[in-house]
Structures are given as structure tokens and as C-alpha cells.
Amino acid sequence: MCGRYRRTTREEELARIYHFPIPAQPDLPISYNIAPNQPILAIRYNPETKQRSLDTLLWGLVPYWSKDDKTCFINARAERIDTAPAFPRPFHKRRCLIPADGFYEWKKTPEGKIPYSIEMKDGSPFVFAGLWDGWQNPGTKEWLRTCVIITGEPNELVAQIHTRMPVILPPETHEQWLSGESGKEILRPFPTKEMIARPISKRINKPENNDPSVLEEGEMEQAGRLI
């Protein structure tokens, strides 16, 4: 499961890295503690213009066939995205990339759960594989655009903390994923050698704590740094 992450790279830099037009105006501020049901940035692909765009979607996919917006999914298991009722249509037609600079998981210990930040060794941003969909309110006729983060088997690093991890796509697969050219075969664990996991402050437990202090080193004696 992936239920919390951060995005601290600004939109202008994301545009340079991921090849989409720079937005005329900044859309969302950076965040150190992104939680479900919040608006997030996602990169989508327009098959008509063959261009990428940066858009704001709500984290928690509401299926297009849902009677209301109460049912939503924050994660989609990679193994079932082509069979689970909510995901086949977006899997085939509505894929996205979700920029991040790190994600958080909690490791169970005798002393309680210890939060970890899992990130790239070089501190660079990366993208989760995602799906998006549109749901129309039957009363107001307004459209709600939502998204989900795909999860899969953990790599050796994350397996020490949790049984699953978000699917991180390497750069050479971005175009294949967005265009729909690939299947589930590219949804693999990201290489362990490129990542680190470090214990951080328990302030991260509350989504309202959204500042750099949530990344301060945590209980090293109990947790230890995972490399």
C-alpha cells in the first residue's frame, strides 16, 4: 500500500525533466506530506496532440460507473489492473505518471510503528505509475477527475519495511506507459541499488504536519538505516 508521499520538486523543474509545457501559472504548492483525497499533480498524455500535460487530479479514483463519489481507490494492485472492476478502462485508455520525491511506509517493531522515507540515493524525483478516470455527478453534471497509484511487489529494500510498494517507472518506460503501448510487464519492482530508506520523525503520522521537519532523522537506535 502507498498512502503517503511527498512532492518537493517544483512544476518548472518537472516540466524540464518529464517533457511537458511549463504551466502558465503554478498549480499546486510543494508538499512534504501528501495524503489520500488531496489534489495532486499528474502527467497525462493527449493522443490527438501527442503531447504531455501536467494536470491536477484528486487522489482516490472514483470509477466512471459509480453511483456516487463515496467509493474511491487510492491504490491499484498491478496484478489486477486489467481485471478488477474499477481499473480495466483506465488501464487501457487513461494512464498517468505521478511525480514524487519520496514515499513513506511504517515498519512494525516491538516498540511500535516507525516511519521511513524511501527515496532515490541521489535525491532525484521519480514517478509512480498511475491511472485516472472521470466521474460525472448525476445531479450537478460536473466532472470529477481522480487517480490511483499502482502498487506491486516490493524490492529487497522495501521488503524489509512493507509487503508492497508503489510501482516506480524508470525513464525509458515513461512513453510506453503513457501511450498505452505496454502491458503489465513493465510494472516491476524498482532497482534496490538506486534507493535508500531512512527512519524519520513520527510527525509524518499526521497529514497536517507538512513541513521539512517531518524528514528529520528518526529513532536510529531502534530502526537503523536501510541501504
Task: Locate each region found by the language model.
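Short linear sequence motif anchored by a di-proline
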Residues: 1-227
